[in-house]
């Protein structure tokens, strides 16, 4: 049985889980994740303590617990378990308080905006924009885009656009390059006025064929030779038009998004 890992937070737990994933990915080991969000009272802390100790009995080994609990009383309750407890606030906040000679706010949920903040509204607006401009659905207001992703079908444009919108508040449109564009040897007409905003995604033809076969098995659309043709033509077009691009084959969405932000010189806060 894989080791049990608890993600305990007084908020959504997104911060703690992201940190835990980064640390645990360094080990060639599968883990069983148990998320325990909104532990915002001592009663909930005691209930969490009980869950952790039950896991010790069931697994026959100590679980690992990542916590981001601001309330010291709740934190001490969870630390009373027999688990390996990794307290992110104690690890990072206390040394920073000493270094900065300041006391932190110790307020719960400060890492995520409320629905009435300007940052939150901007992020929702970016998500709506990206959804409305997914896969070339709309050509309206393309001038408002921060970036326009181009590439063949199934090269990773949609998930990257949505990640940029959700994580960074970037208005990311995406537009497919199709065989008709390659036959004409020109970019789609709606994109011609926005070259400076374009960024291309490519992908290994064999991997593209595998992905497309999941959607349309045995079709010309998914055939290896067709995928090679489309990728070769798309990359040639991007080079010809001076569009920066990268291969998404061996990159995570996070890596792709970070590279795009660097290349197009977009400086956005992560929410």
Swiss-Prot record:
Classification via InterPro entries: Kinase-pyrophosphorylase, PSRP
Reactions catalysed according to its record: [pyruvate, water dikinase] + ADP = [pyruvate, water dikinase]-phosphate + AMP + H(+); [pyruvate, water dikinase]-phosphate + phosphate + H(+) = [pyruvate, water dikinase] + diphosphate
Residues annotated to bind ADP: 151-158
Pfam families: Kinase-PPPase
Transmembrane segments: none
UniProt keyword Kinase, yes or no: yes
EC number: 2.7.11.33, 2.7.4.28
Similarity annotation: Belongs to the pyruvate, phosphate/water dikinase regulatory protein family. PSRP subfamily.
Matches recorded under PANTHER family: PYRUVATE, PHOSPHATE DIKINASE REGULATORY PROTEIN 1, CHLOROPLASTIC (PTHR31756:SF3)
Function: Bifunctional serine/threonine kinase and phosphorylase involved in the regulation of the phosphoenolpyruvate synthase (PEPS) by catalyzing its phosphorylation/dephosphorylation.
Protein name: Putative phosphoenolpyruvate synthase regulatory protein
Organism: Paraburkholderia phytofirmans (strain DSM 17436 / LMG 22146 / PsJN) (Burkholderia phytofirmans)
Source organism phylogeny: Bacteria, Pseudomonadati, Pseudomonadota, Betaproteobacteria, Burkholderiales
